[in-house]
Amino acid sequence: QPIICFLLKLFLIGSSQLFYVPSVCAQDSSSRSEEDREKYVSSQPWQEYLMELSEMEDFEQTAWEDYEEELEELAQHPLNLNTATRDEMEHLPFLTPSQVEDIQAYLHRYHGMKTMAELALIPSISWYQRQLMNSFFYVADETPRKQFPSLKNILKYGKHEVMGMVKVPFYERKGDGKGTDGYLGYKYRHGVRYQFRYGDYVKMGFVGAQDAGEPFGSGRNNLGYDFYSFYLQVRKLGRWKNITLGRYRLHEGMGLILNNDFSFGKLSVLSSLGRTTSQIKVHSSRSSANYLQGAAATYTLLKGLDLTGFLSYRKIDATLSDEGGIKTILKTGLHRTRREIARQDIASNTLVGGNINYRHQGWHIGATGFYTSFSLPLMPEKVQLYKRFAPEGDAFWNVSVDYGYISHRWTIGGETATGDCGAVATLNAASYLVSDHFSLTAVQRFYSARYYSLFSNSFAEGSSVQDENGVYVGATWSPGSRWTLTAYSDFAYFAWPKYHTRQSTQSWDHLLNILYLPSRSWTLGARVRYKEKAGNVTGRLRFYASVTTKNWSSKTSVDYTKYREGNAGSGTGNASSNDTQNASSCGYLLNENIGYHWRWLRLQGSFGYFHTQDFASRIYAYEPGLLYQMSFGSYFGEGIRYALVARS
């Protein structure tokens, strides 16, 4: 049996290989027992539950690799719900701040939980949220540690994890051919990951990654891999809540000036907005774009009053203008050809700033500010209309104030920001729990066309926090214990022309999601979305049915997409277009996911047939994978996608 277990860890049927070797020096009360782990493992992966609480098409705008890395790591090292702090719970994007308050109140009133099934006694926690929490939490009678552990215990009881990954394609790509424009490296993608951790107190590790086509151990990569990430994080060290060195990510306020962490789409707004917690996370993924490099720390000055400081210096990829300035900052992280390598680490960026926030009896207020500079000036091509207000120069600053209030029924949050641009951006959200079965959410945002922040990432219909004025209204209703209806409507207006438009545009976006639970094992769902943006109309329809037992899970889904393109008169398309008729296309996907769990063995399989007329009618689907390797892909044309995965 140990030999079979090792081989299954090493082999992925299809196109990849991966090894994952956890090593535990010893065990103490901070380690979760195998019995507890086995009790709460579900035969259906958490990714599929999360998919139903999110919008598939919004994953294109999400740093999904960073997001999946963090949640997968938490799934591998779940938290004891009885001892988890409010900040730790708020790291999960599917829990609202008011739901976290309800959980904390329940734990305080009843002195903890005996089983995870008690979550059903909290009316504000939905069925899907309970299933997700089973993947990231467990219940045990553990006493929270009162002081930071000794170095001796950290070294003795800490856990070492080593993981390697190799992807072998069974096809030839255009760039694999020899020639001046071909890739300089081989077609295999591989990487290595090491991490040492002791509970929630110490985390240290590194990541080495190589994309297919990149040279390994030669040229600029004389140290082997093209990308490395090193990090060290210490938490709960007296008044020091967090000390992080190396590569890290930050989320301050609601992201109007600083957020290089992930953010979600509109459907998840119903659960994610209202949080303004300052968060420092290690950068342990393969992504070479959204990270800072240096040091960041949070210190508690007084009860409820925290101060965060951060400093970063890193190299960046860029294309240069004829004058020698930065025309475009590149974030692909690909260095396969001579042209891509010539743009590697061509400039540098320095960032220094801080955040201070205060919390008391549900109220919170904070302020964030930073100064950033580049070794070469930013010189965008402002002759293009949509780049007219792009940042220009070599030094920039931004400041913001965030605020809010959280209670059982109300969740209010907002942030207002400005900077050297002299313009203003503001985002404000409010959610009211009318009853245990009905809640309303409203979001207002105004982002001036002249406003910019180089590190912003927040709620928006467009691709950036700039030139947008909109209102969002959403609701969640549970008319009975078996039914849940979620809906939203969002309107946005863009005063300045966007890419491929010639005038002001607007968008309407509507969604309705219906969930029905005929029994504890069966789930039926439907989702319809209608979106009109700059004259282009996209409609999406989805039906699915899933069954989950102790060892088996199965999910069948049907997706249909209809797209209609607006004409040039509506302000869309290329300016040179002479088409007088609107183009339209459609597509569909039939997909099946099956999972099996038995003791240490987990098997997953997916099979899908898709048929779309073009890229505009593309379909999105979840595809299982090994640790930190699964994906949500978009497919167009006609074809079959399948995957078989074995894990232990």
Question: Which residues are covered by each model-predicted region?
Answer:
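Compositionally biased linear targeting/interaction segments
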Residues: 26-216, 220-233, 238, 247-251
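Short loop/turn motifs that connect adjacent beta-strands in outer-membrane beta-barrel proteins
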Residues: 152-159, 201, 234-243, 252, ...
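Exposed, low-structure sequence patches enriched in small/polar residues
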Residues: 183-187, 345-380, 388-648
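Outer-membrane beta-barrel proteins
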Residues: 209-227, 281-288, 342-345, 417-419, ...
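Outer membrane beta-barrel
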Residues: 222-317, 438-453, 602-615
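Aromatic- and glycine-enriched pocket-lining scaffold segments that form the walls
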Residues: 289-338, 345-357
